[in-house]
Amino acid sequence: MSKNYLLAVLALLLSGPVVAADAIAGTVERQPVNMEAIVMFLIFVAMTLGITYWASRRTRSRSDYYTAGGNITGFQNGLAMAGDFMSAASFLGISALVYTSGFDGLIYSLGFLVGWPIILFLIAERLRNLGRYTFADVASYRLKQMPIRTLSACGSLVVVALYLIAQMVGAGKLIQLLFGLDYHVAVVLVGILMVMYVLFGGMLATTWVQIIKAVLLLFGASFMAIMVMKNVGFSFDTLFSEAMKIHPKGVAIMRPGGLVNDPISALSLGLGLMFGTAGLPHILMRFFTVSDAREARKSVFYATGLMGYFYFLTFIIGFGAILLVGANPAFKDATGALLGGNNMAAVHLADAVGGSLFLGFISAVAFATILAVVAGLTLAGASAVSHDLYASVVRKGQASEREELRVSKITVVALGVVAILLGILFEKQNIAFMVGLAFSIAASCNFPIILLSMYWSRLTTRGAMTGGWLGLLTAVILMILGPTIWVQVLGHARPIFPYEYPALFSMLVAFIGTWLFSVTDNSTQGAEERLRFRAQFVRSQTGVGIEGGKGH
């Protein structure tokens, strides 16, 4: 029975807020522990703390701390990007959607994946050639430093805060289950590990934690997919035909369109996922860890390939769950429903193909996933405060490298404390909307500023500031007035804003506001900023003047 409890709560915790309806909510009681999961989890923690110690001996300068000295290779960075982005949420959530809806489950995996070609073709090269530590370096390259960096830092911190809350609650409840610890103690433990990785190891430790997590997740998913295909003689025709025979919907699971009841919400969600990815600060920061634009492009190429492979595996896993889990009464309750809900499908499949040992491995991988993400988020938040706000706005570029590093490390500790407090505060709250809101803000505030600053010569500080703030505020306000918060959280009968995700509308507001207030800007400063675009364009195309490798 303890295994079933663990499976149920793992599915509840890690089913993605964007891809599953169930929130991380309610009280989780302590359950008997899974010893295999604990052993593998402790091995992972010991390994990553060893890496942190190794990284701390090689992290001396500001460049080392923020970007690992620019010495990460394209392949390593691609693996780390994949590790930063592939989540246990998408692993469990998309597999569950395939299990319940068949072909339609691909809609969400495509939404997560399709943003990466945008990064590859529009952003990667110019971002690396123009920036140094954060994306605000790029946005403020020819615009006024103080207001643009303030806006960029605020956008980054809001996204980081929303992500951290979701991750801390999920990680805290997972550790609570695995160790039988009190939830508060579990959240504190996660916060301490997160701070240790970033405080002592900086970007180098964060990168290797993400690489290890990516390898483990890809191995686990590959093993499950191979075992599924082995059961059907490695024949996709057999896999799909047998699934259609077993599934209650029959042939309908191979037809698209069943999940998309509201095309406006679907479009808004798709836009948020596509363009929000290109505005996530912890993803954009990874481009500065490589030596030049060529390695930056290679990073996205490898990351996209690895993630495409991963989402392909989730499709096999979902159909495999129909065969090996859906047809097995051991995984059903008395009513015939899947134990723990449909989000259990992939984890039940792990038990079916690998037993309790492999279930323990998947549990440890789930926690590794959360640690990898929170480490990247914490470093992105710390760099926004120390590099963009403190060094560039408060000290107006006069801060010494040592001073900036000190502020960054203080910020890491502060973010750890805040993350712990918010994790405790939101223990019993519906936080499912937070990841959707984070993507919407990234798509509505960060992405328009980055894109237009690199490609539109008529952009001015006035336009960027107005459009960026309008996009951020519109995304937040519409999310509050929408069905998730206004009805489910606040308890009103009907939402004021009828759609669940605001990106479609908040992005329009951001781009129109930026365009309008830029073209109507007739100030001397605006004219000078337009003239500086040519020099920026040359730098963005050639990389002349960038620092690479250890000098970066």
From Swiss-Prot:
Briefly, what is this protein's role?
Transports acetate.
Q: Where are the transmembrane segments?
A: 6-26, 35-55, 78-98, 103-123, 151-171, 185-205, 208-228, 264-284, 305-325, 357-377, 407-427, 431-451, 467-487, 496-516
Family affiliation: Belongs to the sodium:solute symporter (SSF) (TC 2.A.21) family.
Classification via Pfam families: SSF
Task: List where in the cell it is found.
Answer: Cell inner membrane
Q: Which GO terms describe its molecular function?
A: acetate transmembrane transporter activity; glycolate transmembrane transporter activity; symporter activity
Protein keywords:
Cell inner membrane, Cell membrane, Ion transport, Membrane, Sodium, Sodium transport, Symport, Transmembrane, Transmembrane helix, Transport
Q: What is this protein called?
A: Cation/acetate symporter ActP
Gene Ontology BP annotations: plasma membrane acetate transport; sodium ion transport
- List, alphabetically, the GO terms of the cellular component aspect: plasma membrane
Q: Which organism is it from?
A: Erwinia tasmaniensis (strain DSM 17950 / CFBP 7177 / CIP 109463 / NCPPB 4357 / Et1/99)
Q: Which CDD domains match?
A: SLC5sbd_u4
The cross-references to InterPro entries, in alphabetical order and at most eight, read: Cation/Ac_symporter_ActP (IPR014083), Na/Glc_symporter_sf (IPR038377), Na/solute_symporter (IPR001734), Na/solute_symporter_CS (IPR018212), Sodium:Solute_Symporter (IPR050277)
